[in-house]
Amino acid sequence: MKNKLIEKATELRNKGLTTGEIADELNISKDTTQWLIMQMTTVNKTKQKQKPDDFAINWKTIGSSSSRMQYIASALSDMAVEEGVVDAVVGISISGVPFATIMAEILDAELAVFHPIKHMKNESAQGALSHNFANIKNKTVVIVDDVITSGATITDAIRVCKKNGANPLVVTVLVDKKGLDDSDNVPIKSLIKINKVG
């Protein structure tokens, strides 16, 4: 498994993807992505960083089936409405957008898209909402992503939504690797929560 991840991370890097985009594509942290890429370079073989503590989440069996995506989006929608009425669904690019699109249909809500910091060349900035989708000003929103790894993207999305005049009601995700209950006073609900034992 590790060698396949190293090869895939290197392949994506060679295609020009940023560290953040590779992390998003493989559902791993940016630290893990950097470590994997370093494994393929002979220059860094002598001074490798300590192996990060992370899990790779592969949900391709869900993502490759529109009916499975529908079922998962329905479950995420069900968790969202437990918190209240939603005006718009904000999908975190890239992998949160398919869920958000289906959820917006289920919830009869508008669709917005958030581009996280990790997809930008200048990672000292903050994420941004796409202008090609719904304006979320004065709307109650649910924020959707596939996997929480560190929680930084979710926190950034919440802050950007608030800065743009929205009321983030809840965050829903497929998998939470961090074990978060909330971020910036917004509850986080996950279908699967990974907890480390020991």
Curated annotation (Swiss-Prot):
**Listed Gene3D superfamilies:** 3.40.50.2020
Q: Does the keyword DNA-binding apply?
A: yes
Superkingdom field: Archaea
What biological-process GO terms show up in the record? pyrimidine nucleobase biosynthetic process; regulation of gene expression; UMP biosynthetic process
A Gene Ontology molecular function term for this protein is:
DNA binding
Q: Does the keyword Secreted apply?
A: no
Among Pfam families, the record links this protein to: Pribosyltran
Keywords in alphabetical order, please. DNA-binding, Transcription, Transcription regulation
Name the NCBIfam families on file: PRK02277.1 (NF002620)
- Domain comment? Contains an N-terminal DNA-binding winged helix-turn-helix domain and a C-terminal regulatory domain (or effector binding domain) resembling phosphoribosyltransferase (PRT) domain.
What is the similarity comment for this entry? Belongs to the purine/pyrimidine phosphoribosyltransferase family. GfcR subfamily.
Query: Could you tell me what this protein is called?
Result: Transcriptional regulator GfcR
Source organism (scientific name)? Methanosphaera stadtmanae (strain ATCC 43021 / DSM 3091 / JCM 11832 / MCB-3)
